[in-house]
Amino acid sequence: MLSLLIIRATQFAITSFRCESTIYRYCAKYYYIGFHNHKDLIGVKEFCGKHYILKIIHYHMKAYYMYPDIRGDLISFTSDDDVWLLSLKDMKPLRITSGLGVSTRPKISPSGRKVAFSVIWLKSGKQGGDIYVVEDGQARRVTYFGSRNSRVAGWISEDEIIVITDFHTPFIQWTEAYKVNVNNGKTEKLPFGMLSNIVIKDDIIVIARGYQDLPNWKGYKGGTKGELWISSDGGKTFEKFVSLDGNVSWPMIVRERVYFLSDHEGVGNLYSVDLKGKDLRRHTNFTDYYCRNASSDGKRIVFQNAGDIYLYDPEKDSLTKLDINLPTDRKKKQPKFVNVMEYMNEAVVNGNYIALVSRGKVFLMRPWDGPSVQLGKKQGVKYRQIQVLPNGDVIGVNDEDKLVILGKDGSEKVINKDFSRIERVKVSPDGKKVLLSNNKLELWVYEIDNDNARLIDKSEYDLILEFDWHPNAEWFAYAFPEGYYTQSIKLAHIDGKVVRITTPYGYDFSPSFDPDGRYLYFLAARHLDPTNDKVIFNLSFQRVVKPYLVVLGNYYSPFNQPLDEANSNDKNVIIEGIEDRVVPFPIEEENYVQIAGAKNNKIFLFSYPIRGLRSQTGDVFGRLEVYDLENKAKELYADNVSSFSLSSDKSKILLILKDSLRLFDVNVKPDFNSTGRKGGVIDLSRVKVYVEPEKEWRQMLRETWKLMKQNYWNEERLKNWDSILPKYERLLDRISTRFELSDVIQEMQGETRTSHSYETAYDYDTPEPLSVGGLGAEFEYDESNKCYKITKIYVGDSTNENERSPLRDPGVQLNVGDCIKNIDGEDANGNIYSHLINKDQVILDVITADGKNKRVTVKVLKDERFLIYRYWVEKNREYVHEKSKGRLGYIHIPDMMYQGFAEFYRLFMSEFHREGLVVDVRFNRGGFVSGLLLEKLLLKRVGYDYPRNGKPIPMPYFSSPKVLVGITNEHAGSDGDIFSFLFKKYKLGVLIGRRTWGGVVGIRPRYRLVDKTYISQPEFAVNFEDVGFGIENYGVDPDIVVEIKPDDYVNNRDTQLDTAIELALKQL
């Protein structure tokens, strides 16, 4: 269907659409439209009685093609977030899905009448996914796994597909294969355990493990690199089949050979081996872009490369690029309005103006009336670090990391000085000078009038991110990183003189001047007062941050006023003896993160609640208090605050809350129950954020490229980085959706050939995903009774939230063997999980194992992962206890973040007293706490403390037993790599398993693109004295390699755990 883009015609009704040659009917009138070469729309004269200009569009165009599949002469692929089907006979693509979400990885059924595919949903950070089938133009959902990590591997028959998913596994890296009936949705798990792809032809089964598509890490050679296993006896036994020095993916059986993609020779190409894994051949010779996502019908092969689809015929040894022209309206590429609050990340106030940044665009307005005006460039921009100058103009940073002044009159003055990546900006009160810091750890002062820049200071340890101006605009203060974990407060003059105020032995931050120039306020973590940990034998510092002030002149502290002498109004800064004029506030320590001095002796203190970090997700909101320097009292000012800022004269405060922007005078106590001006509410409906995706996507790609150039840890390794941008920019004209942009960005990031190059999108312009409720159990359909029989109930820890099956809740108490007949009054036929979508509670009609009828109300789980994980851990722990007769304990560490820290101590407390420990870091997702855990394991038991009554206590307290055995695998990475290496290095015990992931170039997560997409750059490369940089893109070899073969899963064997138990018992 031809789509017309009408400029300015935003309100109209199309009463009919009819095609007669080139005659189209709109608003009951006929219009003749001219075409050039039968493809390009070239004009229209009149529309509904008015004249409009039509943008020239293409009826057929080159698009971005992904995930091809082939069945005879039919090709399926995805583009424009939909599935398309074309015949090789006429090459006319037909869209067969519309608007479901992001459709990916289609597979054509043997008859060619059905196509199964994945649908991904990502809306405002919420994500999900499942499998659909389209037949006769109708799409229907056939699985309810609720996981984005689900995809179709292929068809078994006309009625059954194989789906790869992480459903009901303890880790997202652990995916298995399910057989799914597309007619009734019933599922059956295949017994081959962890895999990432599977191909079946008669008795030959080829299984792929490891990565199948890794665009963001080209040249990957670590422990998770793809490899192939083969069975020639229908799955009874398997042998490792193909393992090269690079990634191996997408196996396909064509005649008597197995084809696959690999980049072991530098670039992803098509290869094959015979059924014995010999006679390796290369069939393509691409050198620029990778071959990806290959598929075959057993005769010919298709794959994608740089947005094109190629067809390879093994019999003819011929390669053809398919010339596909897509008739698409590119709906998701059309301009749109977005919510200003959802994408607002900066807001400042000064004088009579408020300025804010939303979706990278700058808007200026008066607080209470008048319009909002967009300043600077309108589209394809990202401004940041804005400040309002005294005349109402706005200064900030543009895409090129240049300071810019955006005039109210629409002008834009670029300050053409190279400061590298500008991290923070602060304008002086007189609007004539700018303090700025950069990614080179430098602090600069720039004078606007004379265009002069001066380097003030440079750290060797970290970014300089906090600074403030004295009201006379001659002095300024900043927090200076002095060491790895220490920071001092420095005072500097614009002429370059610098004085350190505080000693470099604590962590001092958030400097802020009193608006009258008498004091400098700051926060410091210096008063270390430990508290007992409530769980483990340890002490910690939970509330250590205290506000301080520096008396800048020769007068009394406000906390020590003389009886009959008024304080001086002298605003001169006296340097001599200033380090002795640092005074703490007479209040208790708290978790303060920001202090700001305001007019009339008001001081604002912002803090975050001390709470568990393990389950903390989304935005964090804090508590804002105000301290009155006159009456020496502190009170709550506002709660649930995202951030705040003061005007330049510090008389007004601007609050960013979860769903509103509010402005108050610092002397007025806010009334959050009122609306409008009384409640300080800024009317943001005046701000219209209009986005042209095509221009925005180009800006996003360029920023991603530039951030990598600025922050990648080794400048020499990116010496050819300038050539990378045009290589991927040329693909932008072909993409139509935000998902396709992600693919291009990730391919570009992969050119670093380094770990931790991530792009995590926030929104793919899809419907919001609906959760699929969980019952914490496994089922099989009972044909005779027409109900779902419970075959397993996952048992976790009933005292922990989300770690107990709701079928075992009080009053419910269902058991294995009970059969669910109805759910909410509907027959529980088809897929049982289809009855649980978007449900909080359900009513189950049950036939118990002894034949009785029972009705129960069940509160479903929103996420079963925690329960499945706890079940897996407890099963392993019980197994270790049983096999060792209680002599060995078991600990699993799922990551090196908050959950991993908690899991370690949760298990260590109950296991450390045993004679030995099995320490399992398989599937460890990394983080930063490996050193804290290793400290505990390094504390070895050397004796016992004997009480009069009770058992002897290991000494030192909570010390580790002498015998430790570690288990690691290819899915242990990042800080999991480091833990595995140091376990060996410190000779804590034997490490067994498989080579680890191999990604140890760390990141500093702090950058988001204009649409809230998170991107990272590898910034810190780990170099160990033994292996140098050798862990990156290789991993850590265990002392003893132990595989878990697919047939081990068939026979329910964990050979790695068995080996660890055996080795530990031998050492005992």
UniProtKB/Swiss-Prot annotation:
Residues given in the record as substrate binding sites: 927
GO molecular function: serine-type peptidase activity
Keyword terms: Cytoplasm, Hydrolase, Protease, Serine protease
Top-level division of the source organism's lineage: Archaea
Keyword Cytoplasm attached: yes
Region Six-bladed beta propeller, residue ranges: 61-326
Region listing for C-2, in residue ranges: 865-1068
Active site residues of this protein: 756, 974, 1032
A single cellular component GO annotation: cytoplasm
Segments for region (C-1): 692-762
Main location, first listed in the record: cytoplasm
Cellular localization per UniProt: Cytoplasm
Region (PDZ-like): 771-864
Site, Transition state stabilizer: residue positions: 975
EC annotation from Swiss-Prot or TrEMBL: 3.4.21.-
Gene3D superfamilies: 2-enoyl-CoA Hydratase, Chain A, domain 1, 2.30.42.10, 3.30.750.44, Tricorn protease N-terminal domain, YVTN repeat-like/Quinoprotein amine dehydrogenase
Family, similarity comment: Belongs to the peptidase S41B family.
PANTHER family recorded: TRICORN PROTEASE HOMOLOG 2-RELATED
Record function comment: Degrades oligopeptides in a sequential manner.
Name used for this protein in its record: Tricorn protease homolog
Source organism: Saccharolobus solfataricus (strain ATCC 35092 / DSM 1617 / JCM 11322 / P2)
